[in-house]
Amino acid sequence: KELGLSENVHTFSVSMMDNSFDEAPYQRIMSSYARSIHHEIKVSAGDVVDSLFSTVAHLDEPTGDGAAVPSFILAREAKKYVKVLLSGEGGDEVFNAYETHRAYKARRLYRKYFPKAARSLISALAHALPVSHRKLSLDFVAKRFAEGCELEHDAAAHIYWRYTLTEEQKKSLLRFPAPAVDTDRLFIDAYDKMPYPDGLNRISQLDMRYYFIDDLMVKNDRSIMAHSIETRFPYMDDAVVKFAATIPPEVRLKGLFGGRYIEKQALKPFLPAKIFNRTNMGLEMPHSSWFFGGFKDLFMKYFTKEQVERSGILNYDAVKTLVWEHKAQRKDNGRALWCVLNFILWFDLFVYDGNYKDYLVRE
């Protein structure tokens, strides 16, 4: 914008057809401010269903990432205008913008100043809240935070706040004995071996090593390259990462709500106030509400006993429990059901039917 070149730049964003998941109003503010050529891609449940099989075929492995299909849809539109996209992935890890990073600091204060009896009362009140399918709803945040705070290890709490399935749910879903070592134990061991004295640096590294590298980069590369578009990650520039590593963790995350503090202060002169002052929000689908709406036909077809048990891996009774809890709004199992659905589709495309090539994008 400062060089007068922004009017030749194309920007792309996804608009979710659910207000609590939709960032479109802020995206319009930013694109208008930058004077870019903006493309807003509206994504409905029907759009996701139409692109789901192709996305699974290109990802090549089961995934529970709720942004994979929207990214695939965005890239299909971007293909009409550009060959390379710049992605903001990595900024949350480098500058501590995740809600779980703020929760890490809040947990320490919470356990320090609230005795066990008070925490038990707060947890009971949190679990009395009605289930909502809105993004980061009050009941979801309160329940997950209260439960994670009772775990003794920092890494165990961090992974608990990130989980899709609990250890008990994972074991019940399998038709054979689960691995001897729980997932959280693996992350605790990795956390304990990290050469950093500060816990915030350690959980940042956990996210970088296992979430960013094994999920976000894979999702971006495969879903976007499906349309022959390269994705670049400016936040992963060697100089940026090395600089961020020199910033004390208490400055990167200022107080409990100051994620990306240094980055935001540096960019303040170049950002509209409404963008500067808002909190972080990740791209995700409202699958929790869509499962009995726009996903209903897909759900009815692939959650039968025959489909669920076809792989010889999933236990139908456990899946049925997830469905019942979600439908009765006892729990928000939307992310868990999305993972199960993706596994079933992947198994059909790559193993049972073996017809994944029929869904690959042809230039």
Enumerate the language-model features and the residues they cover:
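A conserved beta-strand->alpha-helix junction
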Residues: 3, 8-10, 17-58, 178-186
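Flexible loop/turn segments at secondary-structure boundaries
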Residues: 18-22, 47-49, 93-95, 233, ...
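Short secondary-structure boundary/capping segments
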Residues: 29, 55-56, 99-106, 357-358
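Adenosyl-5′-phosphate
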Residues: 36, 67, 80, 84-86, ...
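Short, polar/flexible loop-turn hinges at active-site or ligand-entry regions and domain interfaces
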Residues: 39, 60-64, 109-114, 250-254
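Active-site adenylate/phosphate-handling loop in enzymes that bind or generate adenylated species
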Residues: 72-133, 217-240
